[in-house]
């Protein structure tokens, strides 16, 4: 298990854009599982939406990408590199994510060719799929 401080040693994201709280499983360059505890104090709820708080889907996808980045950047050969979005395919949102939910963020790296890779990403709440997508990334 990796704490927030250990996560910050691997990926460059910081408040207010660090969207994962813990990594609970990792196989370097293969897969990782992270957690995001969604609270009513999230800054984005001030505008999305003030009277009906829903976590923006793009931030769920970003949280998934950060978990995937952790899986890639945890490997010693990738230390100090950055992981950039190169594409998002077949993204579907199937459940709203609201304050009090705990997002389980799972990313499996499916293919790596040079600095480009693709991963299958799934975010769940209480075992129910909230978001699923294919994420393409580039390491630099």
Swiss-Prot record:
Pfam family, one: FabA
Catalytic residues (positions): 48
Alphabetic keyword roster: Cytoplasm, Lipid A biosynthesis, Lipid biosynthesis, Lipid metabolism, Lyase
EC nos: 4.2.1.59
Gene Ontology molecular-function annotations: (3R)-hydroxyacyl-[acyl-carrier-protein] dehydratase activity
CDD domains: FabZ
GO cellular component, one term: membrane
Reactions it catalyzes: a (3R)-hydroxyacyl-[ACP] = a (2E)-enoyl-[ACP] + H2O
Subcellular location per the Swiss-Prot or TrEMBL entry: Cytoplasm
Biological process, per Gene Ontology: fatty acid biosynthetic process; lipid A biosynthetic process
Task performed by this protein: Involved in unsaturated fatty acids biosynthesis. Catalyzes the dehydration of short chain beta-hydroxyacyl-ACPs and long chain saturated and unsaturated beta-hydroxyacyl-ACPs.
Family affiliation: Belongs to the thioester dehydratase family. FabZ subfamily.
PANTHER family (alphabetical): 3-HYDROXYACYL-[ACYL-CARRIER-PROTEIN] DEHYDRATASE
Identification of the protein by name: 3-hydroxyacyl-[acyl-carrier-protein] dehydratase FabZ
Gene: fabZ
